[in-house]
Amino acid sequence: MRREYNEYIKLLLYFLDPEKIPYVLESEKKQAHQKQADCYKPDSPAYFNSDKVLETQFLLTQILKNDALRHRIISGVCTWEGCSFATERLLQTITDAAELAKVLITGVLHNKDKSIKEFVFAPVPNFIFTRDIGITINDHLLLSNAATAARERENLLMKFISFYHLFAGNEDKLIEISESSDFFLLDENEQKDFKTSVEGGDVMMIAPNHLLIGCSERTTPSAADEVIHKIFSNNKTGVEKITVIKIPRHRAVMHIDTVFTHVRKDTWVLFGKFSERVGQERNDKQFAYYRYFLDKDYVPEHESIEIFRFYKPLTETYLPGKDYLIDISDKVKGLESLLRNISIEDFGIAENDVKIIYSGDNVFPHDEREQWTDSCNLLALKNGVVVGYDRNDETFKAFVTNGFSVIKANELLKKFENKELTPADVKDTLIVLPSAELSRARGGAHCMSMPLLREKI
């Protein structure tokens, strides 16, 4: 897994901070005998320390150097995790910021000989999926509120990092989401219905004035409601359009970024089962009589997608009691037509030039199998250059059919190192990472990133 993730990090450095590459290559060469070169270790003095490719553990280390803040963070984490006072006092004795940051993430205390002494609380391995802990909305940052207890510590740590590092001095640009003030009055069943959780995989800053929000297994209607009010009440976010996409509450499609991602202005990758066009084509080919005989509440997955568009011009005064829902049914019939509409309206693409690439080339069983291994969860490094996993062969074929190249990350890195190519030369390409371990964690390249600054395209 380390090798896989290092390849991903090196790729990001080549595209975003190439000045760090000579140092990383030299470090790898000197420490080829080690499992992990020190340049990749956030707790090492030899860490590459880029200001463009940031690591949460390193950022946490920086704020832990402040004694007053260190005590607050330890106290907050221990309270959150239900630790004993004795455990909290033990953590307070760790004065080395790098060591403490590692403990707060892994939950592991070590003896002086580096052997494991004990677990003080569970690790947070999902911290690798930084997409979910925050969402950049132009120059603002929306902080997530996790749906599951396993990720709550990540939210707490990210709040400290955001308030005291990333947005220090600009705290007014941070947007927080929390439970309603009367949530505690609800009974257990009502609390399940009105829980407020939002995760970054369900929020896409798809254009400078257009935000997408998914209602899913992880992001609740209550959270979508609060985000809409928070955004529309703050014109400084620059957002006029908010489109909410309601998808089935399944783990296989826990966020909307597991169902589709943007590849190029005119191109998207999409899970075909959620496409109304694909559903209609299948029905036209052979009518599905079985639908008459199933439970009355049965709805095919592509028909269970619901889309809502809300619009408030920046020039208009926000009224909390006003309904900003607008009717787009004449141009958006489902998820695929929404993606086409975004390319047309937000990026100026001609209707006939919009391309949809389907997971597994829309062929069973590859479509579902490859969606499960993140064929739709791609990270765009620039317009038309995306990163994914190396195990989705039928999706690769669909990319090639649509005019894209597919190359393994290690092969591309060798071309960069040999001066055969530069990142600027790479166009219309799917770069694939090794994923024997990474894919098991249920998150792809899109999940493993949290863009803070985006170039205009």
Where are these regions (language model features)?
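The feature marks the mature, well-folded catalytic cores of soluble enzymes
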Residues: 1-457
